[in-house]
Swiss-Prot record:
<feature type="binding site">
    <location>
        <position position="184"/>
    </location>
    <ligand>
        <name>ATP</name>
    </ligand>
</feature>
<dbReference type="GO" id="GO:0006281">
    <property type="term" value="P:DNA repair"/>
</dbReference>
<dbReference type="InterPro" id="IPR036388">
    <property type="entry name" value="WH-like_DNA-bd_sf"/>
</dbReference>
<protein>
    <recommendedName>
        <fullName>Holliday junction branch migration complex subunit RuvB</fullName>
        <ecNumber>3.6.4.-</ecNumber>
    </recommendedName>
</protein>
<keyword id="KW-0227">DNA damage</keyword>
<dbReference type="Pfam" id="PF05496">
    <property type="entry name" value="RuvB_N"/>
</dbReference>
<feature type="binding site">
    <location>
        <position position="68"/>
    </location>
    <ligand>
        <name>ATP</name>
    </ligand>
</feature>
<keyword id="KW-0234">DNA repair</keyword>
<feature type="region of interest" description="Large ATPase domain (RuvB-L)">
    <location>
        <begin position="1"/>
        <end position="184"/>
    </location>
</feature>
<feature type="binding site">
    <location>
        <position position="23"/>
    </location>
    <ligand>
        <name>ATP</name>
    </ligand>
</feature>
<keyword id="KW-0233">DNA recombination</keyword>
<dbReference type="InterPro" id="IPR004605">
    <property type="entry name" value="DNA_helicase_Holl-junc_RuvB"/>
</dbReference>
<dbReference type="Pfam" id="PF17864">
    <property type="entry name" value="AAA_lid_4"/>
</dbReference>
<feature type="binding site">
    <location>
        <position position="24"/>
    </location>
    <ligand>
        <name>ATP</name>
    </ligand>
</feature>
<keyword id="KW-0238">DNA-binding</keyword>
<comment type="similarity">
    <text>Belongs to the RuvB family.</text>
</comment>
<dbReference type="InterPro" id="IPR008823">
    <property type="entry name" value="RuvB_C"/>
</dbReference>
Amino acid sequence: MNENLDPTNQKYNPEELDLEKKLRPLSFDDFTGQEQVLENLKIFVQAANLRGEALDHTLFHGPPGLGKTTLANILANELGVGIKITSGPVLDKPGDLAGLLTNLDERDVLFIDEIHRLSPIVEEYLYSAMEDFKIDIMIESGPNARSVQINLSPFTLVGATTRSGLLTAPMRARFGIQSRLQYYNAELLTTIVQRSSSILKMPITMEAAIEIAGRSRGTPRIANAMLRRVRDFAQIKGNGSIDIEIAKFALNALHVDAHGLDEMDNKILNTIIDKFKGGPVGLSTLATAVSESSETIEEVYEPFLIQEGFIMRTPRGREVTEKAYKHLGKVKANVQGGLF
């Protein structure tokens, strides 16, 4: 995937990060889509505010780019509390976590992205903090080492993961609120593109907004990234506004087709067809064949390809569908058994 459009890419330059934050909704009213999740969260937040309690620990899971981080920030805003943000891979030692927990004020939100990547020792350390709002820390070392219990202010842990199946059962059980975010339809993404273009003060036609939305893989983060790139083309190659012609020109230049598939998506499909006769093929073998990590294929590319019906998982591996053959203009070879 073009790194400018990759929903997992964390290597944006400072200007891109600022723009991404600028486009993020700050309240429930500004957030588009995920209606059932949103309605439930509104009730949970109102009830917590009414009782003056910390919101129950909350887990958001689903493909990248659908709004998990945005919703964590919205929860803090709607609760009227502070938020501290970190990620699973960053928390190497219990001491890293202790520093965050002891600096939380009452009812604050601690957001841990990629929570499935917490180390086992840090995860176990988190259990007592989540359940009892207490942690035990070791003072000194050697024969003088002793454990001291520290009381924490009641807080809300918000976890986000793209791979909920990797969460341990004890960790999952400690989240009182669990919400799965779904891919967006084109209509909702069109609304998001129009809202973002308004914030960016970039005029856009309805046709162009629909075109960008239709190629955004059902993902708001990709829709906003595409909009920013199309805006670049509009300012340099166009007349400073986004119409259907400049939108198509820009998206084609970015190698994003009408289905939202990019070079790597099509490479995956072509590889399964050309090298493995349509499949089945194992994930690690496929990853080697396309020079991409298994994790990236499984987290970034595969969910959308399955959602859109281009590939399917079977007990023996990945297989392409008839839709993939039609999309690529290929004819499925007839494979017959027997000796003759």
